[in-house]
Design a protein with these regions (language model features):
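Short, charge-rich amphipathic interface segments used for partner binding and complex assembly
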Residues: 19-57
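N-terminal acidic leader/helix
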Residues: 1-22
Length: 58
């Protein structure tokens, strides 16, 4: 249950980061977009890792 809750929290965080990215996509703000894209990728990677750990406990 704890891993599932953590995975859901990471998904919500990723959604929030995506929400920050969306309005900036048409801008020239690579100084902001680049770290946001990196954060999005890292959160997605963390989600997958937690998901694998959760499956391993079954």
């Amino acid at each position: 249950a704890e891993l599932s809750a953590l995975e859901e929290h990471l998904a919500r965080c990723r959604d929030r980061v995506e929400g920050l990215i969306t309005p900036l996509r048409s801008s020239e703000r690579e100084d902001i977009l680049s770290p946001l894209y990196e954060s999005e990728r890292l959160l997605r990677s963390a989600e997958r890792a937690i998901s694998r750990a959760e499956r391993a406990t079954r």
